Amino acid sequence: MAPRMLIAAIGGATGSGKTTLAKHLGRIIPSLLVFQDDFAPPEDKVPIDPRYGWQDWDDRPGAIEWERQREVFHSIRESGQVPPEHSSHDHLNEQVPVEIDVETERKWSERFAALREQLGPDLPKIVVTEGFLILVDPETSRQFDLQFFLRGDYATLKQRRIDRQGYHTAEGGFWKDPPGYWEKCVWPAYLSAHAPLFVDGDVETGAIDPQQGIELFETQEMTMDDMVNRVCERIYAEVQNKSTAAAEPEANGH
């Protein structure tokens, strides 16, 4: 029998705070972290944009090895573990720290510790995943119990991308955006990939299509503490719901 699982996915543009939020959650909640960047193709397989002659790491079709991602999440759902052949290079990339209040971390750490003690082996295995395209593949999204989208404004996201300098690749290389890459590649690819999730395709200011089951976070209006609190609330409630649902058949003698 497949283990009880709860998978929470955090999407949004580059620089929106996804990874920072996921790592805060990983420190608070006994959980497994999965980073979508680890599903990027090898450097020599990244498509070349014929218009500009540079590698395109951001356009949806070639930015992720989609079948590998689907297989890993299916395996996680079925076994509760990451396949042994899957590896992460997240540790190579430095992040600008965005701290949260110690009281926020303490409060939720204690609540989840108490929940773990209360439920024991009935506590679902919790997985937190994040990525700039993590919500756009319907086959992968079917594995998610909770979905969150972090929306930021153009100017802030662009400046954060500039400040980041570049990205380490799984092979040990380093990718630095060429001039114009944000305007000609990153931003258009982000809008195109996420348009199906929004009413009238309006990614920048529109509402998320209610059928998607995604909760929208406006990062210009929320602190990191706000987002940590909101996601912890949702995960905590979902754990309780799953535990209640699992206990009902036993109570009915089934």
List the predicted regions and their residue ranges.
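Hydrophobic anchor at the beta1->P-loop junction of P-loop NTPases
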Residues: 8-10
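Post-Walker A helix-loop "phosphate-sensing" segment adjacent to the P-loop in P-loop NTPases
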Residues: 27-37
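Hydrophobic positions on the alpha1 helix immediately C-terminal to the Walker A/P-loop
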Residues: 21, 25
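Conserved lysine of the Walker
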Residues: 18
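NTP-dependent small-molecule kinase module
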Residues: 2, 163-166, 184-254
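A glycine- and Lys/Arg-enriched "phosphate-lid" helix/loop adjacent to the NTP-binding pocket
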Residues: 52-56, 139-197
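Conserved nucleotide-sensing/catalytic segment adjacent to the nucleotide-binding pocket
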Residues: 32, 41-107
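P-loop (Walker A) phosphate-binding loop of NTP-binding proteins
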Residues: 13
